[in-house]
Amino acid sequence: MAIIANAEVKTCVEAWSGKVSSGRHQFITDKLASFGGQDKGPAPYDFICTGLISCTMITLRMYAQHKGIELGTFSVEADFNANKEGREWISRRLSFEQTLTEEAHQKILDICQKTPVTKTLLRSVEIETSIV
């Protein structure tokens, strides 16, 4: 067994706020004011989205470098959604400054479904991916 990632959170004085440490990095987590927090940092579901989009960006850049492909500047955005019936899903959107061929478009969508964090989340969360 290998530890892939590690993080620790310690409570702050303010309700819902915590100081997160992950490796050399430290940041604050909190809830939105509308949920009783002070919105001093990302909320837990924000971290799920952040992990997914960070892994997507890194994986696509690694793939492009390995294949000698120029993807140019692009962004990845994600929303965590839930409905009254209890269904949860993530909508992931990629936006490229340059025009992609249909072949590149399909390959990118395929790669997105194979990123390490995507695979982890797919074991318990449905993920919808689109390029906008």
Model region roles, listed by residue range:
Residues 1-49, 61-132:
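Extended beta-strand/beta-hairpin segments
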Residues 52-56:
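Alpha-helical metal-binding/catalytic segments enriched in His/Glu/Asp
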